[in-house]
Amino acid sequence: FGGNSLSCAVGEYILETVLNDSFQSELKEKSLYLMENLVKIKTKYPNIIKDIRGRGMMIGVEVGSYANSIKALGIEKKVLLNVTSETVVRLLPYLTISIEEIDEFITKFEEIIESL
């Protein structure tokens, strides 16, 4: 943190938060919730979503040749998506995301997939 006392204080607070058992428990619940909802979309659109893989909140969605189209449609819906290869859309939400924000994302993501 470069010796800056403010940076050190912020870093300490973040570490305390992230290492807190309740934070980790909530994060695990949210990541399972996100994954379960993505699997529901995959079940509805197996011709588009080939695979979903990840760990925690780092998720890759295998979508074949649709990756760049999904990214472009995401921008229109104010959803930032990253294409990590020609066939994978990477989801990497911030760790403090709420269930309501996950629901909003899932709604928009399904609309994107449905429009293809």
Give residue ranges: language-model regions.
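Conserved N-terminal phosphate-binding loop of PLP-dependent enzymes in the Aspartate aminotransferase
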Residues: 1-116
